[in-house]
Amino acid sequence: MNRLQLLSKGLRLIHKMSEEALAGVPLVHISPEGIFKYVMINVFDGGDASKAVIRGFADCTWHADIFEREEEVFKKLGLRAECPGGGRIEHNPEKKYLKVYGYSQGFGKADHAQTKRILATKYPDYTIEISDEGY
């Protein structure tokens, strides 16, 4: 094999590894209960593949705290992340209820309808409400 063939083979291997890393990223990771800020994150592999994920943690004061924490995780997997927006989530596991509302002052408002669809993949038996009201 010449150098170009070796380089091409190496790039294909790296791309396959980043595709596998992207496939392994959970769509939803949020706090088990309470009212907390959340962000939508678009995660990209080295090629054209991407997916939107939802992250929300009660221990994070700012939307940027959530994004920065998760961005570090994605970087270690060889993935790139962008945040198109955020908001708040009210999570009541006893009532099987989620409410998605508000916006992020730093990132803007996430697409709450898309957030609802993504949350429903992890919480199919929940009632999920969206609202553009509130902060």
From Swiss-Prot:
Gene Ontology molecular functions: protein histidine phosphatase activity
Positions of substrate binding: 37, 104-106
UniProt note on tissues of expression: Somatic and germline cells. Isoform B is expressed in both sexes and in somatic and germ line cells. Isoform A is expressed in males and is germ line specific.
Active site: 63
GO cellular component: cytosol
UniProt entry tagged with the keyword Cytoplasm: no
One Pfam family cited in the UniProt record for this chain: Ocnus
GO BP annotations listed: cell differentiation; sex differentiation
Keywords associated with the record: Differentiation, Sexual differentiation
InterPro entries, per the entry: Janus, Janus_sf
Keyword rRNA-binding annotated: no
Family in the record: Belongs to the janus family.
Function statement: JanA and janB regulate somatic sex differentiation.
Other observations noted: Transcription of janA gives rise to two sex-specific and one non-sex-specific transcripts.
UniProt name for this protein: Sex-regulated protein janus-A
Taxonomic placement: Eukaryota, Metazoa, Ecdysozoa, Arthropoda, Hexapoda
